[in-house]
Amino acid sequence: MNDRARDLQGRTNDGGMPAQGASAVGNRLHVCVGYSCNNNCVFCMEDDREARYARLRAQTPEDVRRMMTLDPDAREVMFTSGEPTLHPHLADYMRMARDLGFPTVGLITNGRRLAYKPYARELLEAGLNHVLVSIHGPNGKIHDMLTRSRGAFVQAVAGLANLAALRNEFPDLKVHTSYVVNALNVGYLREFFDAMRPLHVDQHVFNVMMPDGRGGADMDHLMARYRDVAAAFQAFVAGLDGDGRAKVFLLDIPYCTTTALPDPVRGYVERYFHYEPDGSTTFRQDAGAADGAIDADLLQASAIDGETVTYSKVAKGAHDAAMRVKRPECAACGFDDLCRGVFRQYVERWGWDEFVPVRPADPVP
């Protein structure tokens, strides 16, 4: 077994909340390859499509190889950004990742191109073994409205059905869905779960929308209040049996708002990192620490010399440090060490009333 195949650290299997582990960066590498997208989601964080296109069109296969070889602790690679299945070299990149020894070769996708079974098979044969399909409603009316793409739901479901059919040949395949929870779909959690039952999905990940990109620009219309999301998810989970509860997970919501939920269904967004050209980070780097700096462990300039571009190494925590805030009262919360804070835009709009520090658990005698 090579070094990349070591067990992931910082996970619990005892029914408690998953822990984040010690690393500020994590062991999941996101490789951004999708310079275009065939959906047009109303809440998309990548709202500057022209800049994304220019940035990723300049990225070469050799650049991608260097990204996947720089950090020896990376044991999971996820191809993402835009719609990666539209990239002509995606299968080649997956073969490259497999040959480099990554035990998990993953894909974050809208699932539409997986509706073509020969293409889905090609990716699986290239080494793909973890697929995260973004699907945001129980039917075409809701999903297609949010993606602003007619027929997107039908194709995404067909893609999931193809993956289900191929699992006999590729038994290591794990399939998850990603449902971006917002004000327009928060009321359809159970309907979505029931609609997905025939597709043999391993886990349904419900990510609360970030008030960033298009979501931030149309926040009053799209952003569901955290308290309403927590209440809706609590009602949803209460109606599931044990097997159903084991398949659902709510992410990207402050811990203090979800104390009524069972611990195993709430957690954190897994730490990961990616590379992008120096100076092209899309978040406000001056919005975080008082001195405007972001810790060097989270944002390392000139980490890779590409063939024509020099790349920075950017951890998910850099975005959090720039976009999220805490108040002094947070230091008294039992979740302070785990919590990344609340989006600045959210508290500027609605204040701090929802966020009540949780008393740390009393020590066991």
Question: What are the functions of these language-model segments?
Answer:
Residues 54-57, 144-147, 220:
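Short, solvent-exposed loop/turn segments at secondary-structure boundaries
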Residues 33-40, 83, 325-330, 336-337:
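Cysteine-centered iron-sulfur cluster-binding motifs in ferredoxin-type domains/subunits
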Residues 2-25, 278-365:
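Flexible mid-to-C-terminal extensions adjoining Fe-S/redox cofactors in radical SAM and related proteins
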Residues 66-85, 303, 355-365:
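Short Fe-S-cluster ligation motifs
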Residues 21-60:
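Canonical Radical SAM [4Fe-4S] cluster-binding loop centered on the CxxxCxxC motif
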Residues 61-79, 87-209:
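Radical SAM/AdoMet-radical enzyme domain recognition
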Residues 43, 47-50, 262, 336-339, ...:
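Secreted/processed peptides and extracellular or luminal domains of membrane proteins
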Residues 141, 149-157, 161, 165-309:
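Radical SAM enzyme [4Fe-4S]-AdoMet core and its adjacent flexible, acidic
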